Amino acid sequence: MREQFIRTEMLLGAEALARLQNARVALFSLGGVGGYTMEALARSGVGQLDLIDNDTVSLSNLNRQILATYDTVGMRKVDAAKQRVLSINPECIVRTYAVFYTPETAGQFDFTQYDYIVDAIDTVTGKLALVQNAHDAGTPIISCMGTGNKLDASAFEVADITKTSMCPLARVMRRELGKRGIRHLKVVYSKEEALTPTGWEAEAAALGKRQIPGSSAFVPGTAGLILAGEVVRDIAMAAPEA
């Protein structure tokens, strides 16, 4: 065991750490939520990370995304992510896919090869397709609900989607998954009521333009770290296969 994981082994034990180092996790979306999930998984010793995102780093990402610095503006997020992961753990196997995940691109992925899937996607269509594919493959998945227009990082909870409240995205997901015969999904969601858009965003909404949610440095990142914590605990504490 390398020195960098000593503190993790002290907390989890050698067998649990070995399970993390042998695990392969797929992370869909590397934005304000997913970037922090990636960071924590890399620092926790996850041995293989598949990183999926088709976006590039922009100046508007600087307020909340851990991959965004002036040095990375203009880079593909998957490239910035791989560079960062390997700077933390050079032995991690990192696979990158500059793909916008949709039902049409889902065929590029074999979901049975993953030990865990993390959904940090911000489109309902993509989220539904990802959950459906994970469900069909029998692969554990955790999904993040809405983090935009929120300021209370302490309002997040982990729950089955049937137990959520106050989150419009969770409500839509619950309804649409039910139509697909999927009754249960572990999610991270916020019980905080979304704030009302202000300034230019309100004007855009009034004109019928796409509404971009406001965001902070700390709310999406908190959700991302909670996602990572659930993945690490589920993998590390899993019963050994017979």
Model-assigned labels for residue ranges:
Residues 1-26:
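N-terminal charged helix/coil linker that caps or initiates catalytic domains
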Residues 2, 21, 109-114, 121-126, ...:
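Glycine-rich phosphate/adenylate-binding loop
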Residues 27-29, 52:
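Conserved N-terminal Rossmann-fold NAD(P)-binding element of oxidoreductases
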Residues 33-34:
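Hydrophobic/small residue at the entry helix of a nucleotide-binding pocket
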Residues 42-48, 136-138:
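Conserved S-adenosyl-L-methionine
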Residues 46, 51-89:
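Glycine-rich phosphate-binding loop and adjoining beta1-alpha1-beta2 segment
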Residues 98-106:
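Conserved SAM/SAH-binding loop
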